[in-house]
Amino acid sequence: MNQVRKWNIIGGRVIKTGIAVFLTVLVCEFFNIPTIFAVITAIVTIEPTATDSIKKGLVRFPASTIGSAYAMTFTFFLGHQALSYALAAMFTIVTCQKLRLHAGTLVATLTAVAMIPITADHYFTAFLIRLATTSTGIIVSTVVNFFILPPHYVKTISGCTEELFVKTANVMEEWLTALMDGKVIKKETTYNLSKLTVLLHKAVQFVQYEQKDWKYHRHTKKEMRSFLLVQKQLHLLQQIIYHIDNLARAPIETCDWSQNEKEILRRTIHSIISILRNHCEKIDEEHFKLIDELDKQFWTNKNDLAHCKPNQYHHHFSSESIILFEILSIHDMLEELKQIFEKYESENQLNCSVY
């Protein structure tokens, strides 16, 4: 898998950018207008989603118009001087920010400063030509992004979700080792947990991308159910990772477990790890028995703590109670994941029987 990623250097967006640039140049040559500004606009208009291409294209056009207008105005009054470049850039940035054209600020500023050295006269004509080239770049890129290799992230999201299940289980396993040793977790575990969070955010971002373009593409009922499944799975995995992060911060070294408590805890966490690696498709009865034991243990610890006097213990939860609470919370998420998967499977079977 890593090997595939390593050599997959040309993605869909790279190919679409090349196609957009090629078509933009052809259109510009056909109408006999300059290509460079159209190409710059075409390159930056290719976005992760077709929706973003349309929205940001509508922002970049007026922004580029502003940049072109400032460039021609200052060149007309000041000529090709350093002050013309500076004023054109400054006024373009300020105006775009004031008008909230943030997505078009960079392109507009580049357009403004690039126009100055290549325009000697006929400033208004140059301004109109710039509008034409900018429009060409935006329209061509948007059409390419919409119709050629349209963005589909469902497979990517599913891959990220599967990876999250496995890596979440791995981090839990690393944390269990530290717990059994009664030592602070290793830096490597903390690093793996941070990578897990990054992967989660990446998957959530892909979900947002897919949702934006959902209305533009046809989907079967099965595809819609699959997308909703991974969306719900990611939401619950996010909560599980949150609880694991709390476990990583819990003061393991202050815990005082009996041998029996430690063994139940070890078996329960091993069971959780196994369930995660199987994507929560099945939870056996033995796991529920272990959870019942942990639940009793949690309330026993909580009640014992309530009898402590304030001068003896000033926290509402002991280290043991915190760890037990987080593990029980993770179990709740696992149950929800199992129910979601069972519902998905039953709907698929029902759909197959209908057809």
Curated annotation (Swiss-Prot):
According to the lineage, what is the superkingdom?
A: Bacteria
An example GO CC term for this entry is:
plasma membrane
Q: What is its main location?
A: membrane
**Location relative to the cell:** Cell membrane
Family matches, as InterPro entries: ArAE_1
**Which positions, given as ranges, span the membrane?**
19-39, 74-94, 109-129, 131-151
Q: Which UniProt keywords apply?
A: Cell membrane, Membrane, Transmembrane, Transmembrane helix
Topology within the bilayer: Multi-pass membrane protein
* Keyword Transmembrane listed: yes
The answer on whether this UniProt entry bears the keyword Membrane reads yes
By sequence similarity, the record places it as follows: Belongs to the UPF0421 family.
Indicate what this protein is called per its UniProt record.
Answer: UPF0421 protein BCE33L2478
The organism is Bacillus cereus (strain ZK / E33L)
